[in-house]
Structure formats: structure tokens, C-alpha cells
């Protein structure tokens, strides 16, 4: 052991027996080339030529130094980063195999790979037997783990899993850097849907078999990639130790011990003292790899969920029997069915009020059906409850009839009250007409020639009331509105003239005739036209002027469409001549129209201010 200068780390010396001073530079270049390029076999051949054969102590020391230097290189550190993927692939393959075989104990990855490839080859030959399946079966039988993975779905030309594994295989064989991502690993899980052209009962098993084989190949390829240099060095170390007749060595410390046991005469020969860091004397890179491989690894919940999502879990026969046994123990015996039916509840009885109000017919029918069913079930011949119920209904009906007879006068009173209400409604409408007429008088006084416009306004109110009062047969309001309009147009007065009692009786007769049924529709129309003529003659009301809506209504009834398909009472032309009789306000209407036309001609549009 030699110590370096002050402040430098402690070093250790390893003698390289048989290395001349002239060959030291060539020896160092060979080791540096190995650390840079990684050409293990080429470097070992160069070292063998320097020592004139394999059975030499200097070659043994050189191989151990070479292995120790590789353990501290960046290349080896990168390969150690792949160890996690190796453990992941190993654990995933074993888990898939357990799911496939449905057992608890774990099996080695070699046994898993051999069993899965044999089972897959058997399924392809027996179930399909096509040319592609036969070729794949023969490839699987020759496969030893470290080879280019084939496409495990022979009926498809391309497979993402086979493409990814082929890339990993090429990188490992060329001893290049390998980087595996989680997203790339997901393509190794094959779903049952991808085997759609196989039998449905085979798809689940094919999915588990192919997924398991994919992870087995990933494990074997990456493991070979990590052990590539170390396995070659260890092989030559073992061969050299065998030729020298010494036990195999794996570290620099073991080499120092071995060379220290040799005779001093052998050590005095040509030798080179190689200095190494003291912390690397007992370092074995192969033991570090084994320590990484022996670490306990647990799959993440995401990976377990991915495995479970491939094929739903099926219960084994033992689990089915265990569950059935527990169900039998937890099941309680049900009570025996009763020998006789349970007693029926008493029938429902409806209590009807004596006020004369009877419920809906549907309620009575439903109650009768329920009571009839209940009574029929107890006594087919007839039950007293059913008779009693009919008696109650008959009593209530008789009471209702008596109430109806007793209230006959009341109904007449109600009818008279209804007529009084109609008269009050008519009076209210006439009052509103008088208010409209009074407003019209005020407009006449303020505007001079505004009498025609107010008269027209009064008739428009009469039109609205006429349209609304058709349902109430309100013809008085129309007559009063027309009279007010005509009186205001002629004299400018208030329009509150007395009505002829004869015309009132005629109006009532016409209203009664109009309110008859549809069978007397033609007669009602005739009487209505006759009433319109008399009203215009008596009150001075012009239907064509005062009630435009009324004209449209009568025109539709007389000269328009006849629902019964009969000829109208008057022709349209005769009816128009009848409506366009001698009207005292015809000239004023023309005058007002002429004013509007002048304003329209002068300005081009009508202005409300004018």
C-alpha cells in the first residue's frame, strides 16, 4: 500500500505481473477505450495479446481492474437506472400469471415465461391452425427469452407492443442508452377486444397470456442490457482462474490477497504497480446489481387497476363453495304459508251529506265497485251492507228531489235576479255611453267642427261594447250609441232623447229570437236585419257609419258564408244599399276625409298635430 501526496485521497496499489514498461501505455489506452466505447470483447483481446495468452496473473489483475473501473463509470450508472423497470416488469408478469392461473403462490419469471409461451402456442395450433398461427407457434417454442419479440397476434400485421419491444431489443444489443417511459409500458397490456376474430371464451386467456409474455420479454431484455459487460468480464475471469488453478476472484482486494501469496521470485519479475482509490478495493459491481434486484418492489394501485381492468376476476370453485356455505348459514328459514287466507277488512261505507251536493260520478262508481267486490266476496247471495248503501243513496236522492221541489220558487227568484243583473249591466253600459256622449259634446264645443269626429268616437265605443255585448244580447247599448252619434251630428245636443217603448219591445223580441237554437238560425238572421232597419229609421242611426264592426259582422252573416249552404235573406248589393240610406252626416264625413286628404297631399304624411 502506498500513500499519495498530502491532501490527496488514499490509494491502493495492485501489481500487474508481467507488464513491461514499454507496454504500459498500450495497456492504459485499452482500458480507456473500454470505458469510453464499451467494447468489452475487443478490449479483452488486446489485453490477451499483451500477456501472451490467457493463463497469466497479469491478465487476471487487468480483468479485475477493468471490472472495477466499469463499476464507477457513467455507463454503469445509467444502466442501474433501468433496474426499476426490470423489477416492475418482473412483478407485473408474475401478477398477470397469478391472475391467469388463479393461485396465491408466486412463480419465478423463467417458469412463467416458459409456461405462457407453451400455452399460447398450444391455443394457436388447436383453436385456429392457420399459417400465421402455425408460424408464431414455432417461433414461441424456439424462443429463449433474449430475442426479438414477435407479434403475438398473428391475425394483425402491426402491433404497438411488438414495435416497442423491438426498439428495446435493438438498443440493448447495440449497447446504447435505453430510456423507458410509463406511457410506453401501457402498450404492453393487451385487451381482449384485440382478439375479436377468436372465440369469445378464448379472448380473456389470450389477453392475459400475451400481456404476461410481453412483460417477460421486457424483463429479460433489460436484464441482459444491464449485465452485458459484467457477464463478459466475469466469464473471462473465471476462465483465467481455471487455467491458473486458483479460486475465482471478483474484487481488487481478492487479487491483492492472491498475488501476495505468490513467491517473491515471481513478484520480482517485470510488473507494473497500478494505483486505485482505496474505496474501490473491495467494490464489486456485480454484487451491486444483485442488491438492486433483490429489493422488494410493490406495484402501484394504478398498475393493479390496469391489470384488473383487462379481465374481470372469476371466482374459483373453492371460493364459490365458500360463499355458498356462508350464504346458507346466514339464510333464515321463512315461516310456512298460512293454511287459511287472512280476514278481509270490513267494507267501506260512504257517508253522503244531506246538503244536496253529490260527489263526482267517478268517485261514486269507484266506491260502488269496491263495495260490490267486498260484499260479493263475503256473501255471493247479497249482503245487507250493500242494500243499506243503496237505501242511503236513494234517501239522499229523494232528499235532493224534495229540496229541488221546495226550491222551485227559489230558482224562479234566481232567474228573476239574473234578469235584473242583466238589466243593471245594460244600464251600466248605457251610462258609459252617456259619459262618452258628454265627452263628445265637450269636444264639439272646444273644436267647432269636431262633432263628426266625436260622433265617430261615440260609435267606436258602441262598436267595442257591441262586440263585447253580443254574448249578453246587448243591443240597447248599440242603439243608444247610434242615437247619440246621430243627435250630436245633427243638432250638437246631448243625445239623451226618449226611446220608443214599442221599439224596446221589438228589441227584446229580436234578442230572444237570436238566442234560440241553431235550428232557427235563418229566422234569427232575418229578424236581426229587420231590427237593424227599424233601429236606423227610428233612432237616426246609420249602421254603416256608426258601427263598422257591426257592418262586418252582418255582412258575414247575411252576404257572406252561410253555414247551412242556403241562400242569404238579402243579397250583398241590396244589403249595402239598405245600409247606405239617407244619412244626415254623409257630407260631414266627406268633408273630414277631404281635410285629411289635403293634409296628406301637402305634407306627404299625416301629422297628428295637424
From Swiss-Prot:
Residues 335-348 have a biased composition (Pro residues). Belongs to the herpesviridae BBRF2 family. Residues 586-597 have a biased composition (Basic residues). Residues 394-447, 458-469, 477-495, 503-523 have a biased composition (Acidic residues). Residues 384-393, 563-585, 598-610 have a biased composition (Basic and acidic residues). Residues 327-353, 373-610 are annotated as: Disordered. This is Tegument protein G48. InterPro entries: Herpesvirus_BRRF2-like (IPR008550). Residues 448-457 have a biased composition (Gly residues). Transmembrane segments: none annotated.
Amino acid at each position: 500500500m502506498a500513500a499519495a501526496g498530502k491532501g490527496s485521497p488514499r490509494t491502493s496499489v495492485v501489481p500487474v505481473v508481467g507488464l513491461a514498461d514499454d507496454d504500459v501505455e498500450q495497456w492504459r489506452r485499452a482500458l480507456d477505450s473500454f470505458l469510453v466505447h464499451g467494447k468489452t470483447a475487443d478490449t479483452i483481446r488486446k489485453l490477451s495479446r499483451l500477456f501472451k495468452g490467457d493463463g497469466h496473473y497479469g491478465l487476471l489483475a487487468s480483468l479485475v481492474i477493468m471490472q472495477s473501473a466499469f463499476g464507477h463509470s457513467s455507463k454503469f450508472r445509467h444502466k442501474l437506472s433501468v433496474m426499476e423497470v426490470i423489477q416492475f416488469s418482473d412483478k407485473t408478469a408474475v401478477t398477470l400469471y397469478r391472475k391467469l392461473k388463479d393461485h396465491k403462490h408466486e412463480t419465478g419469471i423463467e417458469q412463467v415465461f416458459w409456461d405462457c409461451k407453451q400455452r399460447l402456442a398450444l391455443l394457436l395450433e388447436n383453436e385456429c391452425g392457420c399459417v400465421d398461427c402455425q408460424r408464431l407457434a414455432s417461433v414461441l417454442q424456439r424462443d429463449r427469452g433474449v430475442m426479438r419479440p414477435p407479434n403475438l397476434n398473428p391475425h394483425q400485421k402491426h402491433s404497438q407492443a411488438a414495435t416497442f419491444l423491438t426498439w428495446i431489443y435493438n438498443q440493448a444489443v447495440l449497447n446504447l442508452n435505453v430510456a423507458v417511459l410509463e406511457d410506453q409500458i401501457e402498450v404492453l397490456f393487451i385487451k381482449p377486444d384485440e382478439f375479436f376474430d377468436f372465440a369469445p371464451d378464448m379472448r380473456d386467456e389470450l389477453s392475459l397470456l400475451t400481456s404476461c409474455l410481453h412483460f417477460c420479454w421486457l424483463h429479460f431484455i433489460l436484464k441482459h442490457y444491464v449485465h452485458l459487460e459484467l457477464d463478459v468480464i466475469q466469464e473471462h475471469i473465471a476462465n483465467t482462474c481455471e487455467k491458473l488453478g486458483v479460486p475465482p476472484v471478483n474484487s481488487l482486494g481478492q487479487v491483492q490477497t492472491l498475488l501476495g501469496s505468490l513467491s517473491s521470485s515471481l513478484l520480482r519479475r517485470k510488473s507494473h504497480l497500478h494505483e486505485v482509490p482505496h474505496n474501490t478495493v473491495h467494490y464489486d459491481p456485480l454484487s451491486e446489481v444483485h442488491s438492486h434486484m433483490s429489493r422488494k418492489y410493490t406495484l402501484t394501485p394504478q398498475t393493479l387497476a390496469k391489470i384488473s381492468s383487462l379481465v374481470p376476476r372469476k371466482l374459483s370453485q373453492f371460493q364459490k363453495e365458500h360463499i355458498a356455505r356462508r350464504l346458507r348459514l346466514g339464510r333464515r328459514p321463512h315461516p310456512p304459508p298460512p293454511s287459511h287466507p287472512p280476514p278481509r277488512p270490513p267494507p267501506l261505507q260512504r257517508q253522503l251529506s244531506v246538503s244536496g251536493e253529490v260527489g263526482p260520478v267517478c268517485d261514486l262508481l269507484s266506491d260502488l265497485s269496491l263495495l260490490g267486490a267486498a260484499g260479493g266476496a263475503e256473501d255471493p247471495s247479497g249482503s245487507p251492507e250493500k242494500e243499506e248503501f243503496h237505501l242511503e243513496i236513494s234517501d239522499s236522492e229523494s232528499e235532493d228531489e224534495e229540496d229541488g221541489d221546495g226550491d222551485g220558487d227559489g230558482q224562479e227568484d234566481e232567474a228573476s235576479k239574473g234578469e235584473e243583473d242583466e238589466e243593471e249591466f245594460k244600464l251600466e253600459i248605457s251610462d258609459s255611453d252617456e259619459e262618452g256622449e258628454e265627452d263628445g259634446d265637450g269636444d264639439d264645443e272646444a273644436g267647432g267642427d269636431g262633432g263628426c269626429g266625436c260622433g265617430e268616437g261615440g260609435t267606436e265605443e258602441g262598436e267595442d261594447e257591441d262586440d263585447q255585448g253580443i254574448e249578453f244580447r246587448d243591443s240597447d247599448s248599440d242603439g243608444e250609441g247610434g242615437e247619440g252619434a246621430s243627435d250630436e251630428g245633427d243638432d250638437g245636443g246631448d243625445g239623451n232623447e226618449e226611446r220608443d217603448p214599442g221599439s224596446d219591445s221589438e228589441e227584446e223580441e229580436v234578442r230572444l229570437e237570436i238566442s234560440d237554437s241553431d235550428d232557427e238560425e235563418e229566422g234569427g238572421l232575418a229578424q236581426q236585419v229587420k231590427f237593424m232597419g227599424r233601429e236606423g229609421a227610428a233612432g237616426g242611426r246609420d249602421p254603416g257609419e256608426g258601427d263598422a264592426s257591426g257592418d262586418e259582422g252582418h255582412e258575414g252573416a247575411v252576404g257572406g258564408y252561410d253555414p247551412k249552404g242556403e241562400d242569404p235573406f238579402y243579397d250583398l248589393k241590396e244589403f249595402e244599399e239598405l245600409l247606405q240610406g239617407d244619412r244626415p252626416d254623409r257630407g260631414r264625413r266627406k268633408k273630414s276625409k277631404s281635410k285629411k286628404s289635403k293634409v296628406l297631399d301637402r305634407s306627404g304624411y299625416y301629422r297628428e298635430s295637424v
